[in-house]
C-alpha cells in the first residue's frame, strides 16, 4: 500500500492572492491537501474570504479540509476562543475543586449549538472537501497522564449540565472520584457532539470527508489519559468518520513509541474500513538530525499508513512556535512528501 495524501495545516486566511502563492509553495513541497485552521475570529471576521481561498486551492488541485481550530478550547490550538469570551458559563468544571475552567463544556446545549452552527455554516458556504476534528479533549486541571508522568486525580467535567445528564442516565449523583460509569459517560458524550455534527454535514453533502484526529497516547495499564476519545475502537468504528488519525509525536520520544502508536492507528483504521493518518511535527521542535524525518516517514510507509499530515506550513516560520530552522525543516518534510507521493502515482 502507498501513502496517497500529504497534508499541511495553514493559518493565513486574510488575502486570497497571498494564500494562492502559499498554495503553490505547498504543491512544490509535495502537498496534496491543505487543512485550513479556521478560528472563531476568522469565522466572525474573515468568513467572506474563506470560500475564495478554498476556490483558489481547488484551482491549483489541492484538497481542502476545514479545521475549527481551537474552538472553545475543545479542539487543540493556541487561538483565543470567542465562545469563552462571550460565555462566562458553559465551561468545564473541575471535579475536585468545582472551579470553572477556560474550556467550553462540549456537553452543554449552548456549545453544541455553537459548534454545529460554525461547522454547518462553513459546510454550506465554503465549498471545502471536508472537515478535520483536531485533538478534541476534556480539560485537565492537573495535567493528566502523559508518556513522561503519572495520572492526576482531578478531571472534568462536573458542571451542572454534565451532573444532570449523568444522574438521569445512571440514577445517582456523579461522583467526584472517577469510576467506570463516569468514564463511559464522558466517552459517550464526547463522541456525540462530533458524530452529530458529522452526520448533519454529510446530510448536506454526502461527499464531505471527515477526519477525526485523537491524541496519540498509549492508554496502557500504566498510562491512560481519559481525554474522552481514548477508546480508539469507538472512534474508528463511527460511521460518520472517514479517516482515523492520531496526533503528532515529539521527535525526542523513543522510536518504539512512534512504532507502537502507528501500528495501533493503522490496525484501528483497517478494522473499521477507514483510512489511517499519522503526523509529522513541523513546528516548535525539530529532530537533532533531519535524517530522522526520512526514517519516520519510511516507518509510516512500512507500517501501511495511508496519509501523512504536518503541522504546520513553513515550520511555523514567524510565529512563537517556529522550529529553530523552520524553513529547512519545511523543505526536508517537502522532500519526503514528494518522494512518497511519487510512489503513490
Question: Which residue stretches match the model-derived regions?
Answer:
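Short, acidic/polar
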Residues: 11-27, 111-122, 223-238, 289-299
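Aromatic-lined carbohydrate-recognition surfaces of secreted/lumenal glycan-active proteins
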Residues: 7-11, 65-69, 132-136, 181-228, ...
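Substrate-binding cleft of secreted/luminal carbohydrate-active enzymes
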Residues: 246-254, 277-344
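Catalytic domains of carbohydrate-active enzymes, especially glycoside hydrolases
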Residues: 16-43, 125-128, 237-244, 299-308
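Active-site-adjacent "subsite" loops/lids of carbohydrate-active enzymes
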Residues: 66-126, 166-180, 195, 291-293
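The substrate-binding groove and active-site-proximal loops of carbohydrate-active enzymes
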Residues: 7-14, 35-44, 97-116, 175-191, ...
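Substrate-binding cleft/loops of secretory-pathway carbohydrate-active enzymes
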Residues: 141, 194-258, 285-299
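Aromatic-lined substrate-binding rim segments of carbohydrate-active enzymes
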Residues: 22-23, 35-86, 185-204
Amino acid at each position: 500500500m502507498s501513502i496517497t495524501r500529504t497534508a499541511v495545516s495553514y493559518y493565513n486566511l486574510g488575502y486570497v492572492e497571498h494564500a494562492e502563492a502559499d498554495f503553490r509553495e505547498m504543491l512544490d513541497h509535495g502537498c496534496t491537501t491543505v487543512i485550513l485552521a479556521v478560528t472563531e475570529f476568522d469565522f466572525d471576521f474573515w468568513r467572506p474570504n474563506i470560500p475564495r481561498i478554498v476556490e483558489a486551492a481547488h484551482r491549483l488541485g489541492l484538497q481542502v479540509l476545514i479545521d475549527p481550530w481551537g474552538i472553545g478550547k475543545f479542539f487543540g490550538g493556541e487561538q483565543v476562543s470567542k465562545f469563552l469570551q462571550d460565555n462566562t458559563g458553559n465551561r468545564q468544571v473541575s471535579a475536585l475543586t468545582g472551579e470553572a475552567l477556560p474550556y467550553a463544556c462540549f456537553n452543554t446545549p449552548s456549545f453544541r449549538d455553537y459548534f454545529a452552527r460554525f461547522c454547518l455554516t462553513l459546510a454550506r458556504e465554503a465549498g471545502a472537501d471536508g472537515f478535520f476534528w483536531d485533538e478534541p479533549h476534556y480539560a485537565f486541571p492537573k495535567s493528566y497522564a502523559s508518556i513522561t508522568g503519572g495520572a492526576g486525580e482531578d478531571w472534568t467535567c462536573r458542571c451542572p449540565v454534565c451532573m444532570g445528564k449523568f444522574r438521569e442516565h445512571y440514577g445517582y449523583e456523579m461522583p467526584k472520584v472517577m469510576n467506570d460509569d463516569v468514564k463511559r459517560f464522558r466517552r459517550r458524550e464526547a463522541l456525540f457532539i462530533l458524530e452529530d455534527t458529522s452526520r448533519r454535514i454529510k446530510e448536506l453533502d454526502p461527499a464531505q470527508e471527515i477526519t477525526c484526529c485523537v491524541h496519540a497516547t498509549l492508554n496502557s495499564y500504566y498510562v491512560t489519559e481519559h481525554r474522552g476519545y481514548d477508546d480508539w475502537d469507538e472512534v474508528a468504528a463511527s460511521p460518520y468518520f472517514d479517516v482515523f488519525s492520531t496526533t503528532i509525536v515529539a521527535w525526542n520520544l523513543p522510536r518504539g513509541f512512534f512504532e507502537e502508536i502507528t501500528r495501533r492507528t493503522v490496525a484501528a483504521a483497517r478494522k473499521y474500513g477507514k483510512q489511517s493518518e499519522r503526523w509529522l511535527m513541523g513546528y516548535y521542535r525539530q529532530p537533532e538530525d533531519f535524517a530522522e524525518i526520512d526514517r519516520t516517514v519510511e516507518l509510516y510507509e512500512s507500517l501501511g499508513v495511508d496519509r501523512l499530515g504536518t503541522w504546520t506550513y513553513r515550520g511555523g516560520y514567524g510565529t512563537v512556535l517556529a522550529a529553530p530552522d523552520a524553513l529547512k525543516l519545511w523543505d526536508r518534510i517537502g522532500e519526503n512528501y514528494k518522494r512518497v507521493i511519487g510512489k503513490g502515482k
